Amino acid sequence: MANPIVAVVGRPNVGKSTLFNRIAGERISIVEDTPGVTRDRIYAHAEWLGKHFSMIDTGGIEISDQPLLTQIRQQAEIAIDEADVIIFVADVENGVTDADEQVARILYRSNKPVVLAVNKVDNPERRSDIYDYYSLGLGEPYAVSSVHGIGMGDLLDAVIKEFPDNAANDEDDSIHFSFIGRPNVGKSSLVNAILGENRVIVSNVAGTTRDAINTQFETADGQKFTMVDTAGIRKKGKIYENTERYSLMRSMRAIDDSDVVLVVLNAEEGIRELDKHIAGYAHEAGCGVIIVVNKWDTLKEKDHRTMTDFTNLIRQEFQYLSYAPIIFVSAKTKQRLNQLPGLIEEVYQHHRQRIQSAVLNDVLMDAIAANPTPTQNGRRLRVYYGTQVATEPPTFVIFVNDPELMHFSYERYLENQIRKAFDFSGTPIHLIKRQRQ
């Protein structure tokens, strides 16, 4: 389930972002143009020779106004904390610098796999210059040009060779979930409170592909859960811990590892832009989503309308998460925390739900009878049949005479009718229009 993480590290102007975009290529998917669904390129999914992985551009993380060398060191620390493999990018035009040497020493001591990319080797004459980089003690330097795509195959071959073996995780039958959100919404308190409620902790196990600690526990009814990356949430004192981009990156990593994500909001502070960015990534990833409003106990002037008003605000600001259940909790007083495991399990089951084709088509035909298909330029959309082709998230192919005739509003109507007929609360569902051959 969890993709390996590759971090790109290096001093400014060596071409980190260009290399990042070259590897990510067109694989950064834009699902829909919806307000709040961000397109930040600090994090992307990529693939090479059938190996899927996630990339983080540490250079995109804003780390205060520290001196340059301090910033680069902090990039290296982030990469060491988060990544399975590190691409250290240097620049053939400037040769080996003091900054390169200091960061190389940090990376070398980390015992994390490091692949050294010497960038801007735009012509064969520059290839001989890369041998100076053996002095960094990081093994073979790979000559690349991220602008022209030269040497990318050899570089990526070296990267995927370092990926960890995930085979040991195949038999894990627990539900993986995580709390995600911006700093100071109470994720750490929720983690501790949940583990306090569920005292039967099975084990603390090393994460599948990295050093983070995932906590497994079992509820009284025997359901097994794995809380993803609790160690990462508990880490304190890092100079970059409260930067927005680092928080966003950590959330995206947790999303990758989870069946269900719990987007945590702070009842005291309301909804911020970063909340919407993080929730947008959860939506795009296609995992199960629950919205958790924490610190509900801190609102002193509550009445019977307060929860309704806050719910309406969430539905307005997170329109793309209309399917996500909302729960109001307090990590401090334990209010409603006992409901969370059951809600997580429910969303997990909806995320894996499969509908028989005959039953699905009855729903589609009833929907079309109640609201006939639209016409465009004298041509009417014809819906022949539908079938479910995947779960996690549930994905349906709808066979039609011409996909161009399926207006977005009618597609949304069909989705709503499917949701009315079957309980898919907490999970996105995808409809794919396909022309019948």
UniProtKB/Swiss-Prot annotation:
The lineage of its organism: Bacteria, Bacillati, Bacillota, Bacilli, Lactobacillales. This is GTPase Der. One of its GO terms (molecular function) is ribosome binding. Pfam families: KH_dom-like, MMR_HSR1. The gene is der. CDD domains: EngA1, EngA2. GTP 2 binds at residues 181-188, 229-233, 294-297. Gene3D superfamilies: 3.30.300.20, P-loop containing nucleotide triphosphate hydrolases (3.40.50.300). GTPase that plays an essential role in the late steps of ribosome biogenesis.
